[in-house]
């Protein structure tokens, strides 16, 4: 209920101050406003309901301040995952720019880079969730972990509203194009569409992160109900499960990215030999001339082609691939 209230109030902070300001900044302002409001009202609510009462959860004595700090952990984890997702999906950051640049090398290079980037992004959110699990346990015991999930989901209404921004802006761009509106209108809708794609990715990252934290809660609760004397009750074990599962994706991403990087370097190295003045370029031009005229190379052209083959730097290409 508190989350719904602050999300409604936060919508009034989503305003673009001028044409130069990115719509993403305005949307982020709404999210952060909702998070701050939720944190403050949660403290008031916890103090009113819990007061000075304390209880023991998971061997840790928990009070109202501990529960509030657990909520702050959840809010911080959600904000961190959202910001990291924006860094990996927004066109103003280096990763997306490098991905677009790799498209100039061909679809294979683009796909390799894209797959590596997508797999690598699983690692940092897992670290954030692992840290949030441990911190929430230190502040609120086992009960602090679900409370942290509540903190992460406290601004869910605002996140879902921003997630809906993507298809709305996309449809606006389609209508503008079909209506034959001016180029300036289409430029604005394209800008909004780009931000919409980012907000959609942020919403998915936020949802997946909160679902992962909820899964940790269910695992701990199951172990407790079944009275299982195993380390699953330890938040360190749960954090280790999250990090360990993501390490596979991280190392796979590094391996795939190395293949793409080596391929791009190989392409640049070979193209440079054909573009620089010398025997290789002369041989390439002689061969293309014969193909264009649909004939076999003349004896003079064969001499030039053989000279180009001998002058080619094969060792440099082998060094790149090995």
Residue ranges and their predicted role:
Residues 1-322:
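Hydrophobic packing and interface segments
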């Amino acid at each position: 209920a508190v989350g719904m209230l602050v999300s409604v109030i936060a919508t009034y902070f989503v305003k673009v101050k001028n044409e130069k300001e990115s719509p993403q900044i305005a949307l982020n302002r709404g999210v952060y406003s909702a998070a701050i409001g939720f944190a403050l009202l949660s403290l008031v609510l916890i103090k009113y309901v819990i007061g000075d009462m304390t209880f023991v959860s998971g061997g840790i004595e928990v009070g109202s301040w501990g529960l509030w700090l657990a909520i702050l952990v959840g809010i911080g984890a959600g904000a961190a995952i959202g910001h990291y997702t924006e860094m990996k999906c927004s066109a103003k950051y280096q990763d997306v720019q490098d991905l677009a640049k790799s498209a100039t090398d061909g679809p294979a290079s683009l796909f390799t880079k894209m797959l590596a980037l997508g797999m690598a992004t699983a690692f940092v959110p897992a670290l954030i969730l692992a840290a949030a699990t441990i911190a929430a346990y230190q502040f609120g015991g086992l009960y602090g972990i679900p409370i942290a999930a509540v903190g992460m989901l406290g601004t869910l209404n605002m996140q879902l509203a921003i997630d809906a921004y993507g298809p709305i802006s996309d449809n606006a761009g389609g209508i503008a194009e079909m209506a034959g509106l001016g180029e300036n209108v289409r430029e604005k809708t394209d800008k909004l569409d780009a931000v919409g794609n980012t907000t959609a990715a942020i919403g998915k990252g936020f949802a997946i992160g909160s679902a992962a934290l909820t899964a940790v809660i269910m695992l701990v609760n199951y172990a407790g109900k079944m009275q299982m004397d195993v380390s699953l009750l330890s938040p360190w074990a749960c954090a280790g499960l999250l990090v360990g599962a993501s390490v596979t994706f991280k190392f796979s991403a590094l391996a795939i990215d190395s293949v793409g990087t080596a391929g791009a370097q190989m392409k640049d190295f070979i193209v440079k030999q054909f573009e620089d003045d010398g025997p290789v370029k002369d041989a390439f031009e002689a061969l293309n001339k014969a193909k264009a005229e649909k004939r076999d190379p003349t004896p003079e052209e064969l001499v030039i082609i053989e000279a180009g083959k001998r002058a080619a730097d094969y060792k440099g290409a082998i060094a790149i691939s090995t």
